[in-house]
C-alpha cells in the first residue's frame, strides 16, 4: 500500500503518542519535503521535532517531481502532499484540512483524516 501524509495527521499522532498506528496500518508512509519542514518548524511541539530528527525507518521523505496547479489556496505542505500522492498513485492520502481534502478528492485521491484512521487500527498498535 502506498500512503502519503500531510503534516497535521503526523503531528497529532506523535503528540498523542500513537504514531505507531501508521506502520501498523500502512507499513511505509511517504511525505514531501515541505511536510518535513513543517514538522521541524520552530513552532512545532518539541516531541514532534525530536521524532522527525530520529525519523523512523517506515517514514520516507520524497520530493514530488511536479508542482501542483490549483485555484484553491493551500499551504505548501498540502500542495506537495497532493502532488506526491498523484505522482506515486497513492492508495491513500492522510490529510485533515478541509480545502485540501476537497481538492484531493476532486483529483480522485482517496483521503483519510487522523480520526478516520483510528478505527482501522489493530488493538495492539
Protein language model regions, located:
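Active-site-proximal, substrate-binding regions of enzyme catalytic domains
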Residues: 1-92, 98, 102-110
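Short alpha-helix plus adjacent loop in nuclease-associated cores
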Residues: 112-125
